[in-house]
Amino acid sequence: SVQSAQLGNDALSKSIHAGIIGFIIIILFLLLVYRIPGLAAGFALLSYVELMLLALNGFDLTLTLPGIAGIILNIGMAVDANVIIYARIREEIAAGKTVKSAIRIGFKKATSAIVDGNITTLIAALVLLWRGSGTVKGFATTLAIGIFIQLFTSLVISRGLVWMLYHMGFQKPAFYGKERVKRTIKFVEKR
């Protein structure tokens, strides 16, 4: 069946609107849970969106619904990368490291997991580009381009922002969130 141009524009508009709402909720969550690193992640995610739109424009690609899906998937992957990094930082702080050391070690420990996850997704995107048809290729193209951009924003821009905030005076462990206390219930002892 053929859809009207108005129906396609309406779906595109609603997708963009939903993406913006989701983006705001994600940033609020990152700020609440990760504090200062969450602020850095928010700016890194904004950088991702800006760079992605510049790349789409630079490659003269049209923004379609499958393209938006690729962008949103990459935003999710970027959030995941930042969560992995900041969880590592919190673990290092909880283990008694200084904030400076925790930032350095946290990024170092998280990098290989983030790169590995993105390589597997890139392989899938390349297979979709190779074997897919029209809309699938549009999704795969934005996904592949977005992987490189979100790796850059997660591992370079986010790192730079965290260090910048650290050097601006945000050096207390409390600014980086607390490792949650793991509560265990000792059922055997309660008898």
Task: Describe the role of every protein-language-model region.
Residues S1-A5:
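A cross-kingdom feature of multi-pass membrane systems that activates on extracytoplasmic/periplasmic
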Residues N9-T64, W130-G134:
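Interfacial segments of transmembrane alpha-helices in multi-pass membrane proteins
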Residues I25-L31, M77-A81, V127, I149, ...:
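Hydrophobic alpha-helical membrane-associated segments
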Residues G38-D60, I71-G76, F139-S154:
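Small-residue-enriched core segments of transmembrane alpha-helices in multipass membrane transport
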Residues A55, E91-R191:
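Hydrophobic alpha-helical transmembrane segments of membrane transport and translocation systems
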Residues V79-N82, Y86-I89:
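Membrane-embedded alpha-helices of multi-pass transport/permease systems
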